[in-house]
Swiss-Prot record:
Domain of life: Bacteria
Protein's recorded name: UDP-N-acetylmuramoylalanine--D-glutamate ligase
Function field: Cell wall formation. Catalyzes the addition of glutamate to the nucleotide precursor UDP-N-acetylmuramoyl-L-alanine (UMA).
GO cellular component, one term: cytoplasm
Signal peptide span: none
Enzyme class: ligase
Pfam families found in the cross-reference section: Mur_ligase_C, Mur_ligase_M, MurD-like_N
Record's keyword annotation contains Nucleotide-binding: yes
Lineage: Bacteria, Pseudomonadati, Pseudomonadota, Gammaproteobacteria, Vibrionales
InterPro entries: Mur-like_cat_sf, Mur_ligase_C, Mur_ligase_C_dom_sf, Mur_ligase_cen, MurD
GO terms for biological process, alphabetical: cell division; cell wall organization; peptidoglycan biosynthetic process; regulation of cell shape
Length: 440
């Protein structure tokens, strides 16, 4: 079936790296199609890289363009409930995202990962281990490189991180294996409630051969599994990929076979043990022999901006967990901590309508000073008696620096999005790392 039959005019909504990847893909693989771009921002990121022969409408919507399109490709940051997109749908014009275009194009095996937390680590590690096992893997999607920019005849396995936003506009992505890691409150400014958010995530299983799900979080299980093989991972409940005692030590197990001791992992924190089990389950389901890649697994230290030690001077650790953009992510970071002295926890930013109170009982058990900043930083103030509000991340670090001593830890794990004061979570983490090195 030729999906492109009758499509002569495509409107791309939202530029940035994803929008640019769509434009570049269309020009390379469908050069006869007319492409127009709409971006409601006055200065869209990426406009300087846009070819001069592609028409760009900035600073608002252009309904005439939209309603004359044969296909609209929308950025995942734009909700389908947006009135202009609703008008397009009402006119019978298909609205898809970049992942759907990728699905139309690719025949090579694909595995994909979604969930509230841990997606990027699982995606990255899956790619690292697949390549170490001799399978040429390309990694991207919601992490790093947009999916359409990955397309190459050399690739033997695509590994995609998919957000709930991307899944909303994806309907035909065939997957060898799909993992749903966990579900916790996030993006409540976009969804009606947790049920809606979960349903968006579950779309990952629509055309998957194997569903890789979390035995410790039954919300990750598909509602309708008739067409699926289901494989489980977990550390609390019985699962096919799990932990068990072996030769007096805790081991990772794959289908009743000991793989390696947890102590041999370089990754820090209990949540990362779960992430590793997920990767083993995914690769096994996709036919990749992960046993050929155990050296790579042992040496893997994780992603930038995810519980990353950026400075360690005079016994004071500075840890960048800027990728913690929701409460569950910050809770995961706190659960794996080993602190000898005082913890200085930096929280705040754009809260996305989240409930921060689940942090309170955990903070009560820690020797913590809570340092709050950002547009929603005030919402953290009632969570702990030590809480103080600051104008900026730099003002926090200037203020606490004189009292830091050996054994202390300064942890940026904000539980919020970054776009009140920073371009993105990477920029936030980079600035924290610079400040850490400056003041350490």
């Amino acid at each position: 079936m030729d999906r492109w039959q009758g499509i002569q005019h495509v409107v791309v909504v939202g530029l940035g790296i994803t929008g640019l990847s769509v434009v570049n893909y269309l020009r390379k693989y469908h050069p006869s199609v007319t492409v127009q771009v709409i971006d409601t921002r006055e200065i869209p990121p990426g406009q300087e890289q846009l070819s001069s022969d592609v028409a760009l409408h900035r600073g608002g919507w252009n309904l005439e363009w939209l309603l004359n399109a044969d296909l609209v490709v929308t950025n995942p940051g734009i909700a389908l409930a947006t009135p202009e997109i609703q008008q397009v749908l009402a006119a019978g014009i298909p609205v898809v995202g970049d992942i759907e275009l990728f699905a139309w194009h690719v025949d090579t095996p694909v595995i994909a990962i979604t969930g509230s937390n841990g997606k990027s680590t699982v995606t990255d590690l899956s790619g690292v281990l697949a390549n170490a096992a001799g399978v040429k893997a390309a990694v991207g999607g919601n992490i790093g490189v947009p999916a359409l920019d990955l397309i190459s005849p050399d690739v033997e396995l695509y590994v995609l991180e998919l957000s709930s936003f991307q899944l909303e506009t994806t309907s035909s992505l065939k997957l060898k294996a799909a993992a749903f890691l966990n579900l916790s409150e996030d993006h409540m400014d976009r969804y009606q409630g947790m049920g809606d958010y979960r349903q968006a995530k579950l779309r990952i299983f629509d055309h998957a051969e194997t569903a890789v799900v979390n035995a410790d979080d039954t919300q990750t299980f598909p509602d309708h599994a008739a067409h699926l093989q289901v494989v489980t991972f977990g550390v609390e409940q019985a699962a096919q990929f799990s932990l068990a005692q072996h030769q007096g030590r805790e081991y990772l197990f794959a289908r009743d076979e000991a793989v390696m001791a947890c102590a041999e992992l370089s990754l820090v924190g209990r949540h990362n043990v779960t992430n590793v089990l997920t990767v083993l389950a995914l690769l096994d389901s996709a036919g990749v022999n992960f046993r050929l890649a155990l050296d790579a697994l042992k040496s893997y230290t994780g992603l930038t901006h995810r519980c990353q030690v950026v400075a360690d001077n005079h016994g004071i650790k500075w840890v960048n967990d800027s990728k913690a953009t929701n409460v569950a992510s910050t809770l995961a970071a706190l659960s794996g901590l080993k602190i000898e002295g005082q913890l200085y926890l930096l929280v705040g930013g754009v809260g996305k309508g989240a409930d921060f109170t689940p942090l309170a009982p955990v903070l009560a058990t820690l020797p913590v000073q809570l340092c709050c900043f950002g547009v929603d930083g005030h919402q953290f103030m009632p969570l702990h008696p030590s809480a103080r509000f600051y104008d900026s991340m730099e003002s926090i670090i200037r203020s606490i620096r004189p009292q830091l001593k050996s054994g202390d830890m300064v942890l940026l794990s904000p539980a919020c999005a970054s776009f009140d004061q920073f371009k993105n979570f990477m920029a936030r983490g980079d600035i924290f790392a610079q400040l850490a090195r400056q003041y350490a």
